[in-house]
């Protein structure tokens, strides 16, 4: 893709429906690539089944990829490897680099996520919102 073609590329925010003050959880079972990975990255917690695969396929299609969310989450080295290689990584590698917080069997994925969501739903909303905001402020201060 040349520079002229890039001018015609429109960025679509695939994560707009996820932006909320409340906690969000992604359950990943299967492939989370390109826009699917972007949606998972927009969630606060990512739990994967052992079947999950993650990748940045935009490089394969000569498309630009906004790297900031991935770099913030896993660090520069692992993010750059994913962005430039176009390779898939498995759930256990995703856990090792911090892309996901937990790996469970496919059969336990939905019950695990539902249990966590139920527990989070029991907490006072104001405390949950304040905790999330404080965590993001702390993260942003640490990266400045």
Label every PLM stretch briefly:
Residues 1-19, 141-142:
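Glycine- (often His-adjacent) and acidic-residue-rich active-site loop
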Residues 17, 27, 33-83, 97, ...:
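CoA-thioester-processing core
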Residues 39, 45, 81, 85-87, ...:
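Well-ordered beta-strand positions
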Residues 47-52, 100-144:
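C-terminal long alpha-helix characteristic of the crotonase
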Residues 50, 76-80, 89-96, 123-129:
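Short, structured loop/turn "capping" segments at alpha-beta junctions
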Residues 56, 90-91, 139:
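A short beta-to-alpha transition loop/helix N-cap that caps and shapes the active-site region
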């Amino acid at each position: 893709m040349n520079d002229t073609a890039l001018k015609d590329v429109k960025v679509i925010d695939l994560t707009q429906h996820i932006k909320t003050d409340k906690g969000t959880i992604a359950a990943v079972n299967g492939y989370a690539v390109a826009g699917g990975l972007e949606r998972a990255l927009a969630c606060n917690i990512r739990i994967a089944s052992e079947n999950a695969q993650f990748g940045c396929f935009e490089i394969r299609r000569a498309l630009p990829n906004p790297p900031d969310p991935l770099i913030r989450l896993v660090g520069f080295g692992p993010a750059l490897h994913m962005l430039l290689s176009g390779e898939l990584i498995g759930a256990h590698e995703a856990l090792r680099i911090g892309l996901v917080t937990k790996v469970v069997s496919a059969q336990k994925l939905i019950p695990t996520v539902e249990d966590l969501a139920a527990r989070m739903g029991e907490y006072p909303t104001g405390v949950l919102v304040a905790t999330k905001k404080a965590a993001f402020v702390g993260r942003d201060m640490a990266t400045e």
